[in-house]
Amino acid sequence: MRLHVLRPTRQHLHRHGAPRVQPLGMRPPRWQRWSVHASVLALLATGALWLVVHFLLRAPSGDGLPHPLEPWALRLHGIAAYVFIAVLGSMSAVHIVLGWRARRNRGSGGSFVAAALLLALSALALYYGPESTHAPTSVLHWVVGLALLPLLWLHIVIARRRARI
């Protein structure tokens, strides 16, 4: 079974007024590409901010309390995560399905989606899981989170090289 996704063109209309359609390409629209890039960068920035504030900065009072920026870094990171999940969901409707069925860039795209799912699951485990699993889950979340941007970059580079061939 072949999936056909069609988009109206601005060319002439058929004789009955129905718009002509052309196949939708593999490349997502600009708003989706920018949304993915912006949300991944926001996740990386807020996650890195939390790591710096949590491990390198202490509260000015010196009583061992977390730095005042720490909860704000987590809040912003959570907001960025919700945006990223929404954007990834919008990508799954066309780009991910078409790419998977066309067997194009499965390794890089699948790795990116797997990393995103692992991040979502580890975030849930950090929020709702037992304290005994918090430290290893946290390290897993950092490592996979720091790998998300290189995975996205790799997926884009592979797709662009393949498009030139």
For each of these PLM feature ranges, what is it?
Residues 2-165:
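Membrane-embedded alpha-helical bundles that constitute the cytochrome b-like, heme-associated redox core
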